[in-house]
């Protein structure tokens, strides 16, 4: 065999071996999704109990989950932007300018944000940019704990698809100021029994929206942890978190 042929073969062997290794490796493994739960604020909304419902569930879906009981979790801007999802469960209270800015910039950059009831839409009443991000703010719950119905209005959306078109709640019926630009998935109608001037008002209950590149999901259900014993209330939050994290479209 000539030296030229030997040189060609010598060059082909490692190339073929490399190709075989790459072919056997298969597709590169997908990066594990990451989520941060931040809970605290008013204890009456049972934030820890609610987190204990949804954090383990997200782990069962393959997420790496971190739980924090301080808003100081928002001080690490780089870490926030590395996440796939932030779930905030924090009613009332105050947030520092740095914490707020880092949270908002993370969502604008593409990190998902999800939450429910006062934990997301009655958090920081003096922070209008935060409210702009969420898409709404609680203002009243006439009658307190009452019986009311929730109607699915976009039954084809993946977050609510297959759920009962109307389901019952015994909880606070949130009256809210809502951004008209949100995409409403479920509503409730006020009877006027406790505030006659709002009789017949149709109020958004579940919505989704964007803030910059980030997806934002909200449900007004979930005054206390036992509210999530209602399958539809629990399922909408579960799917909403997945949507915000780009797991479902």
PLM features per residue range, with description:
Residues 2, 37-38, 42-122:
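Helical hinge/lid and interdomain linker segments adjacent to catalytic or ligand-binding clefts
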Residues 5-10:
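N-terminal export leaders
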Residues 43, 93, 120-121, 189-192, ...:
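Short, solvent-exposed loop/turn segments at secondary-structure junctions
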Residues 112-114, 185, 217:
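Structural detector of well-ordered beta-strand residues that form the stable sheet scaffold
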Residues 58-59, 82, 136-212:
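Catalytic beta-strand/loop cores that center a nucleophilic Ser/Cys/Thr
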Residues 28-37, 60-63, 78, 192-203, ...:
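Extracellular ligand-binding/catalytic regions of CAZymes and related secreted enzymes
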Residues 18-32:
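Bacterial Sec-dependent signal peptides at the C-terminal "C-region" and cleavage site
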Residues 93-162:
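A glycine-rich, often tryptophan-bearing local segment used as a flexible ligand/cofactor-contacting loop or short
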């Amino acid at each position: 065999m000539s030296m030229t042929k030997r040189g060609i073969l010598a060059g082909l062997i490692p190339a073929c071996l490399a190709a075989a290794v790459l072919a056997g490796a298969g597709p590169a493994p997908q990066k594990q999704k990451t989520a941060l739960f931040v809970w605290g604020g008013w204890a009456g909304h049972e934030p820890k109990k609610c987190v204990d419902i949804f954090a383990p569930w997200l782990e069962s879906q393959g997420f790496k989950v971190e739980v924090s009981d301080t808003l100081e979790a928002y001080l690490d801007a780089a870490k926030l932007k590395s996440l796939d999802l932030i779930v905030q469960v924090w009613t009332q209270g105050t947030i520092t300018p740095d914490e707020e800015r880092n949270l908002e910039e993370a969502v604008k950059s593409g990190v998902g944000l999800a939450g429910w009831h006062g934990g997301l839409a009655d958090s920081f009443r003096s922070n209008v940019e935060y409210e702009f991000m969420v898409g709404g703010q609680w203002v009243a719950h006439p009658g307190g704990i009452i019986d009311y119905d929730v109607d699915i209005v976009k039954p084809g959306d993946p977050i609510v698809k297959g759920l009962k078109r109307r389901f019952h709640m015994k909880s606070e019926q949130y009256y809210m100021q809502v951004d008209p630009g949100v995409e409403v998935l479920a509503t409730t109608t006020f009877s006027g029994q406790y505030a006659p001037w709002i009789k017949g008002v149709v109020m958004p209950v579940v919505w989704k929206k964007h803030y910059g590149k980030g997806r934002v999901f909200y449900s007004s259900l979930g005054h206390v942890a036992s509210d999530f014993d209602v399958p539809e209330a629990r399922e909408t939050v579960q799917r909403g978190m997945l949507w915000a994290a780009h797991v479902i479209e």
